Amino acid sequence: MAPRKKNPAIKSSGTTSSKASPLPDWVKGGGPKPPPSYTKAAKQQQTQSAGNDTAISATGSSSSSSPVAAASSAGGGGGGGQGQPREMLFPPGSKTPLNMLYERVNKLPGWEKPIVEPRRHKQGYSCAVTLKKVNKKDASNPFTVTFEPKEPTLRLECQSSLEAKHWGATYALFRIFNHLSLNLALPPGPREYWVKMEAYKKTAPSHQDWMWASDPFEAAAKRDAEKAKKEQDKLAAADAASRGEVSIINAKLNGAAKPLSKAWQEAKEVRLASSLREKIEATIRRAMSIFPSASAAPLDLVEEDQDADTAAPNSTPNIDAAGLEKELTSYGFRRGHARSAISWLTSARIALSNPSSSSTTAAALVDPMLASAASLADREAALEYLMLYTPEEDLPARFKPSTTSESFVTSSKAGASGDALAVGWAVDKLSKQAGLPRKAVQAVFKRIAAAEHERNVELPRLVKEGLALEMMLRQMAGWDSPAQAEEQWTSDAILDAVLFFPTRVNDADKEEIEIKRADERMAVEAVLGDDRVVVPSEHQRLGVQDYDVTIAGPGTSVGGTEDVRLRISSHPQALYPLARDKTHAVALPAFCVVSKTLPSYLKLALTQHLLRAFQGDNRRMDWYDAIEAGDGGIVLSLVEELESMWSKMIDDPPLLSSVMQYLVGPDSAESSVEATPETSRAATPTGPSRIANKRRTGGGRALRRDAEVDAQLQRQQRQLHTSPSYSKMDETRRSLPAASAAREILGLIRSNRVVIIAGETGCGKTTQVPQFILDEAIEAGRGSECNIVVTQPRRVSAIGVASRVAVERGEKLDGKKKAVAPGSLVGYAIRGERRASRECRLLFTTTGVLLRRLGAGGDTDLKGISHVVVDEVHERNVDSDFLLLELRELLRRNSRIKVVLMSATINQETFASYFGKAPCISIPGRTFAVEDHYLEDIVQQSGFRPSGNEWRGSARGGKQIEQEIGQLRAHLQAQGVDEETCKAVESLSRSGGRISYELLGAVVRYVVERAENEELSGAADGDVGGAILVFCPGVGEIRQAIDAITTSVRGQSKVEILPLHANLSADEQRRVFQPVGAGRRKIVVSTNVAETSITIPDVSYVVDTGRVKETRFEPESGLTRLVECWASRAACKQRRGRAGRVRAGECFRLYSRYVDEKKMAAQQTPEMRRVPLESLFLEVKSMREDEDVKEYLNKALDPPSLASMDAALTNLIEAGALQSDRGYKSRLTSLGKHLAQLPLDLRLAKLLIMGTIFGCLGPMLTVASIMSCKPLFNTPFEKREEASKARASFAAAGCRSDLLADAAAFEEWQTMRAQRKTNGEIREWCESHFISQSSLRDIQTNRLDLLSHLQEMGFVAPDYSAFGVYDDERYDMNAQHAGVLRSVILAGLWPAVVRIDVPSAKFDQSSSGTVQREAEARQVKYFDRNGRVFLHPSSTLFSCKGFESSYLTTFAKSSTGAGADSKVYLRDATEVPLFALLLFGGKLKINHFAGGIGIGSNQSGGDAKDENWVRLRANARIGVLCAQLRRLLDAVLDHAIDEPQDMFAVPGCKDVLSVIGQVLQRDGLAA
């Protein structure tokens, strides 16, 4: 600081240098130093000074000190005005608000020093604090916010600028740091101000929340963006209001009415290209005439905002016409449209309620697309009519799309040049200005071009455009029709006249024409006034001398809400007004009605009305005479006519079909097909379906005594008994234990309706009991009354047993010829194959085939059957339990039929009680001794030691497995097993039950060597038996076992390895029963099909893995899966018994005694109690259409739980397989009838059906196989990121599906195999992509199995190849369209839908305004109906930042943790196209006020949380069209029940499937 100046004059005046601090008054005056301002003495002194300060001296100096207004703060600089003493605002040592603001802002990155500016106003001082932050994108333009307390209770009125600075700083501190308790550090004064601001914040409204943001710059950017949006919405609302439209602004209807929820505001908009919409409408009209039943089906559509009173269907002709008209017009419909809908509805109701009504009344139902509306509520029916028949541009705003899906540049103009481009723009002008259909205008221009070429004439561009309008007018009036007018009125006449205008019209006439047209325009201006005659802008003109005559319009002299103008056009070669005798065509003025507010069809209707006054039934002679004379003056007449009628026509518009009938073809115009009340009523779904009709009208031929047949059968029996080969076979049969019990068995059957036979393995019950019954009947002369059906649980069992019985009776079934010898008594029938003669009396079949015969097979009471023998009844699968239930009911209806139940391990008491204490008989077995070898025995005897390579990297650990291993060791030690063997058994047991193929191969090799040694030593008979039977759980395991055996067994030429499972053909299955060549040993590797019924006669050794695949329900996926688990002890006993049929045998069990005793259940749990019941429900409904399924299944041997039945009902209704109107009595839908024929999980079956009909069968076979197999990708914990990237590499652009990515991986593997890549290359590829080779093989096997099901039901042609490249046009036309594939996946998985919640948009400020910040993938949230869920990191969609749709469908869910910490993860997700939801989702619910469509549960009265779970913004017309397409799809499926392959040939079916496919390909957008 500079030294203070010493000059006395300066000192006395108080003047100092600019660098020196000013002198206080008490120094200059030489008085005592005043006390500090915050002391009591200072305050008393201020009071006294204020009271005495009243006089002012003449020199301008005060007579006494002025009151203290401001002073320096504690440690603060600055002062008051001149002559005022400085004041301390805060106690010494206080931290001032200003300093606190500087310090805290300085710590914030990028923030600049605050600018604190005091501002003076009338009441004192206020303060504004400006904050700035560095803008990294534009350093010269930092982000800026300003804080100034303007709230009434917080406004500053400080006495000094310094005080204002501190209080302003306090305000700024609170705005930024209100979440902190800074008031504790503030001095008195600002501290109380802080508390005051806290109180204000608590009571502040929610819209002021932005004020308390810790980052004011971000809050300001967001607020600016919201303000800009509101301004745009306000302008949009004003624009809509000016056009008389209704729009939704700020979540309200025109800024008023009820507010919309956040879900509706954020819903995605569905867009439908107008070209696609027209195609859909044309397809619906054509297809409804082919499928009239679809028109009568209930419309799967309701209105969400519909009142309860109006929701009920009205079947009477009584309609509140006035009230309904008022309601419809309140929605914005024109009064004429509303009246038309009410008139139609009234006629439709009369026609339906009175079948004898006149044909005129019945004509109300001329369009079958609307027949169903007659059974809807009044408003709903009227709205459907209006949605379908009101031109889209004339719909109220809430009912039509807000945006267009068409491209601005059409294909006709893209890349065009020269004349083509000029024609394109001319077409646009005529379409937009006159409202003419684009296709019709294009057709006229083609006619003009053809005429030019033919006559070698080239017209000027303006002439061609004017001529096109003149030709369109004549065509629209109908004068081109021979029955409508003379030749001179046609468009061809005017075309010819204009082409030859230069040669046929002389110069004088040309000049006269020009003069008359000019005079006429002057007359119009003189009569109407210059303000009503307007020249349109250049780009709107249709000719060179166009002018508009205003008829009505807001803001004009004539006024009116609608814009109506008559445009008069001319061109250089126009004929008007030329007399008729001077031209070959009638010379009319070229005119049209133009408007900014009217829809195109109303503009055309007004124009058409004026045209018809020249010619036809409505001809006005004065107009006609004026045209004939060529005097002109017709324009004023047109204006007068238009003025008198335009408002009436707009209020009550004509039908669109009458306006467009001459402009468009019949496919585009509204065509109709007449329907009568009788045809409509007959087609209603309340009538019996074809299946029900078959049940009632069908019926097998009842058994009758036929002496001729009896005699023939006895002759055959004698011939059999006298044949040379019979004696040996008879000897074999008599040696079976069943033969000694034959008399007792037959006696029980004769005297009882139901008999239970428990026969030990090998007793011969399966082959002999049916023959006992047949032989007795034939011998008694009653063979004609004997017809036996024997059911087997598997196809291979039915074939094997039938073949054996045929041999015993001297017949042959195992040949390659499909036909059997006439008169053969033994045959078999399996799904897709039947080998039996017409005289067959002993038919072996699968359980499912007999169930279908009971259902839709035409013999519901089995009147043509005398005995039903159910074999292996102990297995308790769903089909066998269902068959028992059906047979128990059948016994009441059919008094003659007999039922025999057989099994080796049957629980006699359970079955006897179920069938009313039916008698039981037991037959002892005839088997040789079988020696058991458990795992510990095998290891000890063979010396096998596991290498450890098989389980490396996959051995399971943990407390549970270690505890089990400890118990196993104790069990082994109790048997006296040595330590080395214990360790080997423990090592093999650590796999958790997984099969060791190294062990399996070694055991088979050991058995082969052991058998050879025994046979060489004579310990075993080498001529009898010696075959080895290996039991594996599934087809994939069979393949691996064969590989292991092939590798292990020495001298492979000495063994023949054969697989055996249900997927093999009948010929392949027969090979296992045939003997092998001398010196060779047969090894059969089989699933549990060889466990019962089938007897491979030469088996002496059984190798049992102890594993089986059971159908179980997985809660996390909700899918039926085949789960590998331990077999039951009863099943293993059956397997063991296979070894002792022909000689002493041995059973090698690849599991320990500990597993046998502790892990295996005694009996298998009935399948009906452990699997989902959807398939069973479908089967029951296909057989008993109106049955209460719950009540019926409660009669089963072991009824399923109520919870599982409720779940099945819900799932079937949601899947669209079951109607929802009658609960457990509801009928099957068309889709449900197809699903009932597929013995698959509901979702897989639906996926395959939909994939077939929509041309993507190949990919869906793969996807369905992936769903039913173990995961395709192996994900090691330590390489999760690499595995996820590998899976994502298969997700092609537009795929957006985990399942399709997996399918792409499988297809690449198939391609590598087709290219004959080496096993090493394929293995390396799999390892590099973390793909399981066993899963790939399983998927391939499953594809073949699934395809066979579709081919057996006739849905897919037999020549379709499962190994193709998706090039079959019938079934794979859409295989490359990701939109169709994702839609079909949604169809199969609905209602497993998850909502995507993208975070609210955030904005950054820039020099050009605010810019939206890109969202991060981790900010995207997902919600199902129960709350928030999470996408699994392995999903290919996990890193997606944005989605085209707002919904995903997921195949599986998994949960981690428990309680509040648990998270639900989604797996196998697929993004869902919006139209897929509309076409394949739940019930559609139109919300007119929200301008959207909700998609909820298919169930009536479903859970509230399921209602409108999916919300889409779309106009009601889209909802109605989608509902109509749904009904047509049902009709196509219904048609395909009898002729499934006709879907692709019948035009109606093909058109419906094609148009739906086109919609799904681009999600409603034009191609």
Curated annotation (Swiss-Prot):
Signal sequence coordinates: none
E.C. designation(s): 3.6.4.-
Ranges annotated as biased composition (Gly residues): 74-83
Domain Helicase C-terminal intervals: 1003-1184
Skewed-composition ranges (Polar residues): 10-20, 670-687, 713-726
Biased composition (Low complexity): 39-48, 55-73
Coiled coil residues, start to end: none
One GO MF term attached to the UniProt entry: hydrolase activity
Record-linked Pfam families: DEAD, DSRM_DHX29, HA2_C, Helicase_C, OB_NTP_bind
Keyword vocabulary terms for this entry: ATP-binding, Helicase, Hydrolase, Nucleotide-binding
Residue span of motif DEAH box: 871-874
Domain Helicase ATP-binding: 746-924
Residues reported to bind ATP: G759, E760, T761, G762, C763, G764, K765, T766
Family: Belongs to the DEAD box helicase family. DEAH subfamily.
Protein's UniProt name: Putative DEAH-box ATP-dependent helicase UM11114
Organism expressing this protein natively: Mycosarcoma maydis (Corn smut fungus)
Lineage: Eukaryota, Fungi, Dikarya, Basidiomycota, Ustilaginomycotina
